[in-house]
C-alpha cells in the first residue's frame, strides 16, 4: 500500500456514494434526519420570535435597530463581493471538472449549483445571526436593569443556541439531500462544491468584516 500510494491520484470528488433508493431502511433513516433538521430550523425561528417579543425600552430598541441597519449595509456590500468571488470560483470549478475531469455540462452545473447553495446558506445564517444578536443586545441590556442574573444569561444563551442550531440544520439538510437525491458518482463532487461555497461565504463574512 505504501509503495503504490504515490500512484493513486484520487480525492473526495472521486468518492462514489451508494444508491440509497435501493435500500429502503437507509433511505428512510436519512429522511428522518432531514425531518429532525427541519425541527432544528423551526426551533431557531421560534427562539427568534421569543427573543423579539421580550420587552425593552424604546430607546434601547432604537439603538439595536440602528446597529442592525449598519450591519445590513455591511451584509449587502459583502453580498456583492461574494457574487464576484463565486464567479471566479465557478470558472475554476468549470475548468477543473469540465475540462480536466471531462464531466458533462449537466454534471458541472449540478456542482456549481451546490456551491451557490453553500454560499446562500452561509449568507443566510450570517444575516439571521446578526439580526438575532442585535435583537438580543437591546433586550439583555434592559433586563440587566432589573438585577436578575438568570434572565440576563438566558437571553444571549438562547440567541446563540438558535444561531448554532439553524447553521447546523441548514448544513445537514443540504448534505443529506445530496446523499439522497444526487447520483452517487456526483455526490462527492457536490460535497466539495457545497463546502467551497459554505467556506467562501463564511470567510468573507467573518474574516473580512469581523462582525462576529
Set out the residue ranges of the language-model regions:
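Hydrophobic, small-residue-rich transmembrane alpha-helices and their short perimembrane loops
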Residues: 9-212
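N-terminal secretory/membrane targeting signals
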Residues: 1-11
Amino acid at each position: 500500500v505504501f509503495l503504490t500510494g504515490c500512484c493513486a491520484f484520487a480525492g473526495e470528488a472521486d468518492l462514489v456514494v451508494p444508491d440509497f433508493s435501493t435500500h429502503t431502511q437507509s433511505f428512510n433513516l436519512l429522511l428522518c434526519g432531514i425531518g429532525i433538521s427541519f425541527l432544528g430550523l423551526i426551533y431557531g425561528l421560534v427562539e427568534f420570535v421569543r427573543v423579539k417579543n421580550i420587552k425593552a425600552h424604546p430607546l434601547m430598541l432604537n439603538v439595536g435597530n440602528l446597529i442592525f441597519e449598519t450591519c445590513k449595509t455591511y451584509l449587502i456590500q459583502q453580498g456583492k463581493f461574494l457574487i464576484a468571488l463565486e464567479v471566479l470560483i465557478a470558472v475554476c470549478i468549470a475548468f477543473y471538472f469540465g475540462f480536466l475531469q471531462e464531466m458533462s455540462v449537466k454534471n458541472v452545473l449540478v456542482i456549481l449549483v451546490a456551491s451557490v447553495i453553500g454560499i446562500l446558506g452561509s449568507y443566510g445564517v450570517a444575516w439571521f445571526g446578526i439580526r438575532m444578536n442585535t435583537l438580543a443586545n437591546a433586550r439583555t441590556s434592559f433586563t440587566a436593569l432589573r438585577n436578575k442574573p438568570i434572565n440576563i444569561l438566558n437571553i444571549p444563551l438562547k440567541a446563540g443556541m438558535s444561531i448554532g442550531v439553524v447553521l447546523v440544520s441548514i448544513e445537514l439538510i443540504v448534505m443529506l439531500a445530496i446523499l439522497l437525491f444526487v447520483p452517487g458518482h456526483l455526490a462527492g463532487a457536490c460535497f466539495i462544491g457545497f463546502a467551497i461555497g459554505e467556506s467562501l461565504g463564511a470567510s468573507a463574512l467573518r474574516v473580512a468584516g469581523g462582525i462576529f
